[in-house]
Amino acid sequence: MADKKKKVLVAIDGSNISTDLISYVGESFSPVNTDIVLYHVDVEVPELFLDTGIEQEFFLKMHSVRAWMIESQKRIEEFMKKAEESLKGYGFTKDSITKKVVERKSGVARDIINESLKGYSAVVLGRTGVSKLKDFIIGSIASKLLGKMHHVPLIVVGKSHNPRKILIGFDGSDCAKVAVKHVGDFFTGGDCHVCLCHVVRPINLTQLVEEPENLPPENLPIDE
């Protein structure tokens, strides 16, 4: 029986980081058993402004903000089309690619989390994005998700020259074992090289001998 196809949520904002993200997804995931959902949260006002707590109506009256909104919508529409064509070039079919543009509800990060609860196998996004309004940095959604998303694997993508070469920091914990499992599930193919890296801290034996309080009770010296 054929394995069930995995559904991957790819959060994009149309920036250069998102372009690198699409290339990474195309080169890393198998088009045979993966469905891709291109997901964008549309905000009326840049996230940086929303974080200031200043009234939204004030910014909507600004010509530069209205221009940003129109430009942002056009950019996302064009990017979605280009992203779909790019993924087709990697072997994905039109039926395996879904494009979703939704209005911001609870915040970009929280909206992504809520979407990820709908049967996804993983979430992929870039490290940060940049708006075109006075070169303001929108703020890293990835950093907000790292501490909040525990139910599915979160893959944060930067600029990668070799997405088929993977380094796993392995400490023998249950979480590390889960990471290995997910890498095996997603990054299939004979051309994928995985390195398990475990760093051992050196033990200062001299310090242990000189400071008996650092020794376990059974190893403490006994006075005659």
Predicted regions and their residues:
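A generic structural signal for alpha->beta connector loops
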Residues: 33, 94-96, 151, 191
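Residues at the C-termini of beta-strands that transition into short coil/loop
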Residues: 42, 103, 158
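A structural preference for short, hydrophobic beta-strand core positions in alpha/beta folds
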Residues: 38, 96-101, 156, 196
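Gly/Ser-rich helix-loop-strand patches that form or flank binding pockets
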Residues: 3-7, 17-18, 22-31, 109-165
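Small/aliphatic-rich secondary-structure junction motif
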Residues: 2-65, 165-223
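Short, flexible loop segments at the rims of nucleotide/cofactor-binding pockets, characterized by
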Residues: 99-104, 133-134, 146, 172
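Structural beta-alpha unit
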Residues: 1-3, 46, 67-123
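Alpha-helical scaffolding segments of alpha/beta enzyme cores, especially the outer helices
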Residues: 27, 82-85, 144, 185
